[in-house]
A protein has these predicted regions:
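Conserved HGGG/HGGXW glycine-rich cap/lid loop of the alpha/beta-hydrolase fold
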Residues: 6-66, 259
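Glycine-rich His-Gly loop
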Residues: 26-30, 99, 212
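Active-site loop/oxyanion-hole signature of alpha/beta-hydrolase fold enzymes
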Residues: 39-42, 51-96, 257
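Active-site loop/turn elements of alpha/beta-hydrolase fold enzymes
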Residues: 55-57, 123, 242
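Conserved hydrolase catalytic core segment
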Residues: 91-127
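Conserved serine/cysteine hydrolase catalytic core
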Residues: 174-231, 236-239
Length: 276
């Protein structure tokens, strides 16, 4: 089932698994869409409604548009939260964000009152992937999606040439190509965004930070999470042994269990709301 929300003429589409109780909204990062997260949705042992946002640049949502920035994404997410809060009888939602989607969710949590809890899986903040930006922009200008997929895996995520070669031979490569189209603009927006780490510690809702054990203390994903965790002393950090940055693809069942555990913990903390 799908749901559509509109903001300033741009359609924002979400997948929707129906249920009862407090809704969960999932915000994917770059190189991912709602379909990429379906394995996690299917594995979630909960009866609650689950929504997954197809951010701008992912069909059937609209394009990034002129003047695209992280603020664009934040305002999109706040509009979606407004719409889902109305659809779900005005109750607060539990919000989950991964990677770039984690940054967007984190920023929205400081601006929207309808968030009951926040769970972030390896959110990223600037500086991030700067060494790959020029190459990504050249690939974007050339319309070379294959090259963009290669760059993000090799030069941003740090995967081996062998891994990328295997990925290129797999059916997943064709699904990744269109997801690479907005990548240069998204990475530019991320590095242009002055995230206020000191302000994150003031968020009143329960916060869980999820970290793949393989990334603990190392770039490119462990370091941003460590910085965010240091700025949020009340947040709970959960390390997932044997996982990296792609548990939603490589081990969706395990990631789903950690998400449900975070939601259960948040419920035990009691209801909280973020001031507007």
């Amino acid at each position: 089932m799908s749901v559509q929300v509109e903001r300033e003429g741009v359609v924002l589409a979400l997948s929707h698994r129906s249920g009862e109780g407090r809704p969960l909204l999932i915000v994917p990062g770059v190189m991912a869409d709602a379909a990429s997260w379906q394995g996690v949705v299917d594995a979630l042992c909960t009866t609650r409604p689950v929504y997954v946002l197809n951010r701008r640049g992912r069909r059937p949502s609209g394009p990034l548009g002129d003047g695209y920035s992280v603020r664009t994404e934040i305002e999109d997410l706040c509009r979606v939260l407004d719409a889902l809060g109305t659809a779900e009888d005005g109750g607060a939602l539990d919000l989950f964000g991964w990677s770039y989607g984690g940054l967007i969710a984190l920023e929205a949590a400081g601006r929207h009152a309808g968030i009951h809890s926040l769970t972030l899986y390896e959110p990223v903040v600037r500086p991030f992937g700067l060494q790959a930006l020029d190459a990504l922009r050249r690939a974007d200008e050339a319309g070379d999606l294959d090259r963009a997929v290669e760059i993000v895996n090799r030069d941003v995520s740090g995967f081996s040439a062998e891994y990328v070669a295997q990925l290129r031979r797999s059916p997943a490569w064709q699904a990744l190509r269109p997801l690479a189209a907005p990548l240069a603009q998204e990475l530019t927006a991320l590095n242009d965004h002055p995230a206020d780490l000191t302000g994150y510690g003031d968020l009143p809702m329960p916060v869980t930070l999820l970290l793949g054990g393989d990334n603990e203390g190392v770039p490119p994903y462990g370091e941003p999470l460590a910085r965010i965790a240091a700025a949020m002393p009340r947040a709970r950090v959960r390390v997932m042994p044997g996982q990296g940055h792609l548990a939603h693809v490589q081990d969706p069942g395990t990631l789903a269990r950690y998400i449900v555990e975070a939601l259960d913990w948040a419920r035990q903390q009691g209801a909280h709301a973020c001031p507007r």
